[in-house]
């Protein structure tokens, strides 16, 4: 239940710009995050080493830059960043983007 997890307010997530609010469940097998990316905010570019990431958009529109491509994930769509690849994401809209991100630990 994400409502039972304390919300973190992060400025410049992974070296990006703006605000990200996150409730994260973390154990030794995965990191599962319920996040709100504010208008104009972005993450920094980062690589998934020893993990991958799946981001599912609950509301809003998330612009994702993955390797050499740009894609827009809308409500009900997801973005997948395989292990070893780079990505960064941003909210190019005037509305919050709410998404669920799952980052398993690969062994």
Language-model regions, residue ranges each:
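Short beta-strand segments
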Residues: 33, 43, 69-71
């Amino acid at each position: 239940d994400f409502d039972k997890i304390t919300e973190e307010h992060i400025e410049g997530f992974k070296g990006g710009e703006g605000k990200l609010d996150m409730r994260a469940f973390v154990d030794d097998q995965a990191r599962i995050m319920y996040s709100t990316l504010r208008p104009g905010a972005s993450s920094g570019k980062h690589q998934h080493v020893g993990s991958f990431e799946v981001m599912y958009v609950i509301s809003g529109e998330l612009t994702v830059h993955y390797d050499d491509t740009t894609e827009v994930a809308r409500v009900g769509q997801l973005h997948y960043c395989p292990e070893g690849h780079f990505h960064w994401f941003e909210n190019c809209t005037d509305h919050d983007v709410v998404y669920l991100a799952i980052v398993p630990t690969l062994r």
